[in-house]
Amino acid sequence: MVKIRLKRAGRKKLPVYQIVVADARSPRDGKFLEVVGTYQPTAKPHAVTIKKDRIVYWMQTGAQPTATVNSLIRTTGLLYELRLKSMGRSEAEISAEMEKWQEHQAVRRQKRLALKSHRRSAKKEAEAKAATGGEA
């Protein structure tokens, strides 16, 4: 069975992963068939680059992505695009849907960042309140 999975590269405490197509029996950093992308988890935000045409080719030939790679592919919108193609949508409809999807993802990202900053400020206020309340 052929898998699309991560292969670790980089150095100690600074991982960079290659998204590779490999036989399921080969070790994590062992032999592989093709490099189809990269993933940098330490970048802010996480950097994912993929070769969409090669991933589509390998998935059509039966390669199974691992759970982690599947979630990375999903964040790029490739699985949604493939689903639209399988539903028989035209290229114009697919591009319009993908634009809507990207806008929706940008809005979700902004909401998450706003919530994160709100939580940080609330935590700082609570700490300041506890510090002043403890001295009095």
UniProtKB/Swiss-Prot annotation:
Cross-referenced Pfam families: Ribosomal_S16
Molecular function via GO: structural constituent of ribosome
Signal peptide: none
GO biological process assignments: translation
Bias kind Basic residues: ranges: 113-122
Cross-referenced Gene3D superfamilies: 3.30.1320.10
A Gene Ontology cellular-component term: cytoplasm
SUPFAM superfamilies: Ribosomal protein S16
Region (Disordered): 113-136
Keywords of the record: Ribonucleoprotein, Ribosomal protein
NCBIfam families reported for this sequence: S16
HAMAP family listed in its UniProt record: Ribosomal_bS16
Family per record: Belongs to the bacterial ribosomal protein bS16 family.
Name this protein carries in UniProt: Small ribosomal subunit protein bS16
Organism (species): Pelodictyon phaeoclathratiforme (strain DSM 5477 / BU-1)
